[in-house]
């Protein structure tokens, strides 16, 4: 499985492997709302999660442990759920583990250029 990199940014788009579990409940492409997506991305931790998935992913999807976030499990569960319910990420259940990836094609279809802005954003120190 080889990744393709979009020319405008270094967003990696990996093909979906065969035999994946069904995704958890999420909004359809036509149900994605800009205010909901931007609301989810307004949290710096969630914005960082999405950027890491877009720019550093070498696998199709990742568990929350891959991100190296020093947060309680309940907090991470909340943030990943917010991203999924906003339609930004797709999650699948693998036994006891949930793995996530960004819905690049869906978000590009609904909000062209949004993910390029997210990928190009440079975090500032507070």
Model regions and ranges:
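Canonical helix-turn-helix DNA-binding module
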Residues: 65-86
């Amino acid at each position: 499985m080889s990744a393709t990199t979009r020319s405008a940014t270094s967003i990696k788009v990996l093909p979906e492997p065969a035999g994946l579990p069904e995704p958890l409940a999420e909004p359809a492409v036509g149900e994605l709302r800009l205010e909901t997506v931007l609301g989810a991305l307004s949290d710096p931790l969630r914005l960082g999660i999405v950027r890491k998935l877009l720019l550093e992913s070498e696998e199709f999807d990742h568990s929350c442990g891959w991100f190296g976030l020093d947060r309680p499990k309940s907090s991470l569960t909340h943030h990943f759920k917010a991203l999924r319910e906003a339609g930004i990420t797709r999650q699948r259940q693998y036994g006891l583990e949930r793995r996530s990836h960004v819905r690049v094609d869906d978000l590009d279809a609904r909000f062209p250029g949004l993910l390029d802005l997210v990928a190009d954003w440079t975090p500032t120190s507070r």
